[in-house]
């Protein structure tokens, strides 16, 4: 994504976060978002279909960040010897990711879409653990 698009998406994101601090997501309009972001409505619609598409996009970006942290902290060799240390390192990295994105995570968890976000996050965590971390363990049941 080019720099201008990233800058515009960040402005939209920051505007949405600021508005979500003031009121519930379902009460926020696209007009309010574009006014706060200082962009045109047309620019908003170049990036998103509607505010729900925007929220879905932000949720997916957050889930991808968490997945990347988890996958980048799985040792490729000497898995058994490093497993305990790697779990610690992975948790530390997930907590860093949370710290860097705590405002968004807090707003996503308390928004009217929190059940959707939590389900997506749970599904992604389950996939990473069962398919990437423990792919050879059959019948591994997780309760996340």
Please report, for each region that a protein language model flagged, where it lies by residue:
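Hydrophobic alpha-helical connector segments
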Residues: 71-101
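Short hydrophobic clusters on alpha-helical segments that form packing/core surfaces
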Residues: 8, 12-20, 66, 98, ...
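Amphipathic alpha-helical packing segments from all-alpha helical-bundle domains
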Residues: 112-138
């Amino acid at each position: 994504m080019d720099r201008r698009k990233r800058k515009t998406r960040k402005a939209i994101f920051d505007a949405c976060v600021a508005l979500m601090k003031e009121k519930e997501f379902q009460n926020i309009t696209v007009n309010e978002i574009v006014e706060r972001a200082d962009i045109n409505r047309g620019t908003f619609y170049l990036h998103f279909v509607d505010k729900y598409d925007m929220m879905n996009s932000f949720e997916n970006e957050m889930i991808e960040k968490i997945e990347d942290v988890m996958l980048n902290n799985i040792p490729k060799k000497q898995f058994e010897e490093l497993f305990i240390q790697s779990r610690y390192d992975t948790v530390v990295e997930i907590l860093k990711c949370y710290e860097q994105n705590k405002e968004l995570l807090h707003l996503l968890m308390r928004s009217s879409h929190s059940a959707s976000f939590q389900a997506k996050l749970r599904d992604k965590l389950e996939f990473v653990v069962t398919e990437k971390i423990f792919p050879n363990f059959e019948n591994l049941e997780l309760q996340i």
